Amino acid sequence: MMKLAGVVITFFPDIPELQKNINSYIDDLDFLVIWENTPIDKRNYKEDDLKNISQKVIVLGVGSNLGIGAALNQSIQHFLDYDCDYFITFDQDSSFDSGVLNQYKKLVTENSGEEIGVFGTNYISNDSLSYSDDSDSLIVNECITSGSIFPKTNFIKGLFFNEDFFIDAVDFEYCYRIAKTSGLTTVIFPKIILNHNIGYADQSFLSKLSDNYSAFRTFFLIKNQIYIWRKYPDLFEFKRKIHLVVKYITLRIVSVVFFEQDKYAKLKSIIRGINQGLSKP
């Protein structure tokens, strides 16, 4: 039977909601690391609130926000000596319906092969599925980190996440890189549904025009996506290139200038993101 260790990265979590989400999959995990990215001086809860969710939980962190890539890497490093075959990663707002993770594990076992580097799910966000295909499995260019299962052998080979990608596109960059450098494919199972919320965008009227992200988030979103476009132009799909140019840059500038607060910082972050995305080696 597959031995599966989990990692969930938390940042200012709602503890009851986090507990509910973890309880939706903890029975099908052998261990779970909760990596706490919330700065220790800004938490309104105790570490025991996390530990008490389950006896399988191990709480790790350094007291500050390391970003997604580094938090995933340090959590997985912790597990490399454990008796497990695969790792599954979660966002704090992700969950499975009853029995879904057990079914997912069976599919991974049945479809495992040396050529597969990532297994992913069909996630539901805002009442919409990301894939409408009813195939049993699909080979894709990329999948989101949350709900993805990674063979332990990836990390034994040194295929860790890019820590430069503090937030945004950590998942896409990983899938593209292991495909290019190691010939590993990404496979999703359209019938395995993950309940998930994409991003941290403002859900007001303004979001119809452009995602009202902070200056900090805006910088990494633009920088990282321009970088993976340059680095992996054949894998970063045309529709994503259009989305980046139109929504994340052009419409975002319009939105910031006419509707958003903190205009100077956000416009500066857009320019910095473009410059660093184009110049990063």
Q: Predicted segment positions?
A:
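Conserved donor NDP-sugar-binding/catalytic core segment of glycosyltransferases
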Residues: 98-131
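Short, well-formed alpha-helical segments that are part of the catalytic scaffolds
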Residues: 8-27
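Non-catalytic, C-terminal membrane-associated alpha-helical segments of glycosyltransferases
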Residues: 233-281
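A recurrent flexible, glycine/aromatic-enriched loop bordering the glycosyltransferase active site
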Residues: 132-150, 212
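A short, conserved alpha-helix in the catalytic core of glycosyltransferases
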Residues: 154, 158-159, 164-198
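Glycine-rich, basic loop-to-helix element that forms the pyrophosphate-binding segment
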Residues: 62-79
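Short beta-strand-to-loop acidic/aromatic patch adjacent to the donor-nucleotide binding site
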Residues: 84-95
